């Protein structure tokens, strides 16, 4: 079974994290959630996730993909040298890096969106050197980006397809009566 890791910190966007987790699990992927703070993480609307894995124990070699949900505290992730190093490790290994809403700004500021097709929360779009698309989800090579909380399901299916293939994504869509 392919494995995905997700990073949370306080202020994460609940629907982006939990919705993506649920779709990936329905698609047969193993998903481990890590707390940047090595403790419980509370989302922007008060949902607290417990029993999270400590970020300090995350080993990139164990995973096929990295998922970065958005939320108002995305800058905490961006300011972490350890998170930046993890993203670089995944990118350089050609593994899937997926970020939604505010999450893609971490990739953009680090230069990973240069020459790439991408999306992100509209008001957070800067000149990242790539081609911005006003779509719910955009995949370009090993980078998957999502626009906003409303785009969570489309984003999650794009991640599932990038990791497990189109057949698995289509089967999972059918199982939940997704368009």
Residue ranges and their predicted role:
Residues 100-136:
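Short, glycine-/small-residue-rich phosphate/pyrophosphate-handling segment
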